[in-house]
């Protein structure tokens, strides 16, 4: 079975928006052996969308469109589908009721908003739990809003429906092992000899949250993947921070709540400017653990808020092991994280170059400070400092709960 993806939106062609939807779609369809035949970007122009649909229906079994489902004049994807199929656009009365509930929270909808719940006559709608416009499916064509969070909310619902309708079964098994603290090339050199089990494809994918070792095979070879995963843990366990949909912040949260009493945590951040705290509080329920974040960017704030000694700052400088250690002393929770560094582009010296970061970790009475020299632009250095802080905390917590 083959599928084609159309990304609808002039903003995708002029660089105003970056596509991430097609990656997600391809990965999900791949699990059922559905091949992506093509991916195309189409402007918000009726003739171009209908022309694209004509091409697609001759070449693939499933046509997926994202974008153009909103209430404005240039949102014409469903209108183009209806025109191509020679069907009327009708209001989905069930979805209209849902839309009214959503708008009631802050304003009443006007007539243009009801455009979001229109569909080609006979189409099936899929409820949008995080936005306004539902996805619609008819005659081998499905349209989703362009917002990634809305697509990810509805795509599993559609896929479940489509799989059942076409009597498909999962053909591909995918296992992701998430690593951090080891470079992609070193990782490959370290583990590539382990991939000897038959008919298993492997690749290394660099993400913001780590480097993935992706193992892919036919569903009947699932046991062979399990054997490789076991070997990976035996060889590189110190760098493994999770599997599949695991994320480091969720794993840390689990570690904080393994005992009879939840552990509390706070952060004192300079160069990361609250990024460590922000990542942690993405986890639902962490309010029982997370107490505060102090962004002490200036020396004055470090002295006043965290009781860092003026003498320490004068002798060693703000970017130093000693200051990272004293920043932790100002945190009164079970666990503390401190960051201080030079994110650039300016401010570096020969002794303290741009990218130099000190990360302090306090767990109960044990304190460790890690020195890192990170590469990249300002945002990359800050992102990597945040991830290194969480990675080092996880490694310490993992040892304590074993």
Curated annotation (Swiss-Prot):
Signal peptide: none
Superkingdom: Bacteria
InterPro entries per UniProt: CinA, CinA-like_C, CinA_C, Competence-induced_CinA, MoaB/Mog-like_dom_sf, MoaB/Mog_dom
CDD domains referenced in this protein's UniProt entry, alphabetically: cinA
NCBIfam families cross-referenced by the UniProt entry: cinA_nterm (TIGR00200), PncC_domain (TIGR00199)
Family: Belongs to the CinA family.
Protein name: CinA-like protein
């Amino acid at each position: 079975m083959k599928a084609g993806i159309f990304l609808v939106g002039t903003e995708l062609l002029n660089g105003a928006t970056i596509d991430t939807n097609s990656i997600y779609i391809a990965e999900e369809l791949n699990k059922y052996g559905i091949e992506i035949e093509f991916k195309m970007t189409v402007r918000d122009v009726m003739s171009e969308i209908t022309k694209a649909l004509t091409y697609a229906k001759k070449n693939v079994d499933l046509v997926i469109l994202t974008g153009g489902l909103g209430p404005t004049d240039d949102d014409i994807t469903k209108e183009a589908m209806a025109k191509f199929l020679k069907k009327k656009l009708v209001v989905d009365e069930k979805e209209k009721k849902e839309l009214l509930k959503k708008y009631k929270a802050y304003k009443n909808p006007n007539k243009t908003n009801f455009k979001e719940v229109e569909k080609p006559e006979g189409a099936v709608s899929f409820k949008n739990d995080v936005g306004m416009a539902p996805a619609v499916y008819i005659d081998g064509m499905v349209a989703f809003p362009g917002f990634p969070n809305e697509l990810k909310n509805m795509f599993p619902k559609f896929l479940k429906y489509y799989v059942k309708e076409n009597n498909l079964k999962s053909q591909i098994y995918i296992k992701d092992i998430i690593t951090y603290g080891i470079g992609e090339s070193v990782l490959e050199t370290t583990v590539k000899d382990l991939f000897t089990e038959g008919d298993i494809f492997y690749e290394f994918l660099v993400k913001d949250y780590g480097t993935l070792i992706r193992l892919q095979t036919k569903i009947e070879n699932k046991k062979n993947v399990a054997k490789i995963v076991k070997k990976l843990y035996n060889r590189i366990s110190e760098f493994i921070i999770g599997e599949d949909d695991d994320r480091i912040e969720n794993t840390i949260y689990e570690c904080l709540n393994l005992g009879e009493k939840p552990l509390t945590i706070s952060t004192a951040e300079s160069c990361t400017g609250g990024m460590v705290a922000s990542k942690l509080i993405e986890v639902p329920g962490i309010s029982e653990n997370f107490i505060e974040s102090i962004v002490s960017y200036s020396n004055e704030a470090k002295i006043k808020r965290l009781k860092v000694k003026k003498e320490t700052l004068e002798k060693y400088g703000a970017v130093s092991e000693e200051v990272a250690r004293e920043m932790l002393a100002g945190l009164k929770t079970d666990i503390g994280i401190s960051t201080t560094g030079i994110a650039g582009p300016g401010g570096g010296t020969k002794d303290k170059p741009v990218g130099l970061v000190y990360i302090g970790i306090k767990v109960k009475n044990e304190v460790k400070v890690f020195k890192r020299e990170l590469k990249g632009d300002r945002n990359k250095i800050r992102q990597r400092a945040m991830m290194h802080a969480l990675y080092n905390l996880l490694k310490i917590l993992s040892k304590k709960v074993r």
